[in-house]
Amino acid sequence: MSTQNALSTILVEKITNDTLVLPTLPAIALKVRKSADDPNINLSAMGDVIGQDPSLSARMIKIANSAYMGRSIKVNSISQAVTRIGLRQIKNISTALAMEQLFVSKNDVVSAYLQKEWANTVNIVANSMAVMQLYIARTKKREMSMDIMTLTALTHNIGVLPILTEAERHSEVFANPTFLEVAIDKLAGRIGASIMREWGFGEEFVNVAKCWKDLSYIPEQVTYIDFVRVGAAVSGAIDGQKDAVLNLAIQRDVIDDVAILHSDEFADLAGAAKQIFA
């Protein structure tokens, strides 16, 4: 059996037997999500929870001051940031900002792959957020929220993590980028959907993780997966399908013209979004 097939066989067997170790949410994200679900939580208490993590606090202030909050007056404290963002969006935004903590490894090859994967993910997130911002401005449709958009884009390829964990356990055999690419292409969507269910995330997250590369999956209405696909296409993450993705986006009125993706406005919005994760 080839090394490539061996890795795939081990992964498929563990998926089938429900023995694949799935990543858990970072502790601070779990705390914030639990607090957000408390009907008695207030903005001050939420600020105290987020304040336990200096890195998350700094990024929360950064997003509160970003173009996506649409305010010109800067906030300087976590309490001000939480007040501006609001309890409804805090749950998903804080989870999104904590996700980078999952992309770590002690294995040099796997670590390099994770760093590359995180950078690619941030690019896709930034592009997806920019596309949605332009869509809302053009259509005035506000059924979808930017906080869910951000988190669905950040978790769209989360299925790579257990694959890389398995590779790390067998580093002398499996830590080969070619083998990893094949396993990821075949199994990441299926595993990603399992992670989203394990974390208790909604079906929109499951569908994006499972189907973002599968262009035969076309929801009846425009939804988050449309923006993730365009974001991925602009980032060069959908090999050989960029034209198909963009044509589908035009058909579904996600964008009205490909030219918008080359505009200064798009570049500015994507750049502002990317800075949130810098």
Task: For each feature predicted by the language model, list its residue ranges.
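Terminal helices and disordered tails flanking the catalytic cores of nucleotide-processing hydrolases
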Residues: 3-14, 253, 259-278
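Conserved alpha-helical "signature site"
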Residues: 1-155, 162-169, 175-177, 183, ...
